């Protein structure tokens, strides 16, 4: 999965955001295992996945707060 853009994230429904976070967490888990066993080639993907999760959660919180 490539780096997610904020416009794409804002267009997602809350359920889609939850699914995307779950998928990224699974990917991050697998990437950590690959790094531990020395099989990880694209080390920057770990950082991208972590930041994508944070980006999705931040936008979701902003949208939740805006509704109040």
Curated annotation (Swiss-Prot):
InterPro entries: Ribosomal_protein_uL29 (IPR050063), Ribosomal_uL29 (IPR001854), Ribosomal_uL29_CS (IPR018254), Ribosomal_uL29_sf (IPR036049). GO terms for molecular function: structural constituent of ribosome. Keywords: Ribonucleoprotein, Ribosomal protein. GO terms for cellular component: cytosolic large ribosomal subunit. Transmembrane segments: none annotated. GO terms for biological process: translation. HAMAP family: Ribosomal_uL29 (MF_00374). Belongs to the universal ribosomal protein uL29 family. This is Large ribosomal subunit protein uL29. It comes from Rhodopseudomonas palustris (strain BisB18).
